[in-house]
Amino acid sequence: MYKGDCLQVMDYLISKNIKVDAIITDPPYAITNFSWDQIIPFNEMWDKLLKLIKDDGAIVLFGNEPFSSNLRRSNEKLYRYDWKWLKTQVTGFQNAKFQPLRCYEDIMVFSKVGAVSSCKKPMCYYPQGLVNINLKVMRSSVDY
């Protein structure tokens, strides 16, 4: 596990010809005027991520709208699915007079391999720590 500026850490790992199973990062969303909160150019980011990730690895990125939609569109070919992180503390108090507080964050998963059983070599997924919420899951009443 590495902690640091992701572009610098990725450059270091690439220079050592290291390939990794997973990349989990929380890039800046450009939702404030702080100097550190500037979107990393997507082309540069994807170039580095793809040099580092193993062919069957997962790239997991955090975000909020509208950044999340832009991030998904930046690499639709490798986008697989989202998780929603329900936070224990809401955020966005500085904008509370203008919009609802945010209680969740998007977690977007990208991979070079597919995420469905019909793929030649689908991504591995081993759920852990699942909590039974006792809800009946019903099928949609509309057939597509």
Question: Where are the regions that the model predicts?
Answer:
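Core catalytic lobe of class I
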Residues: 1-144
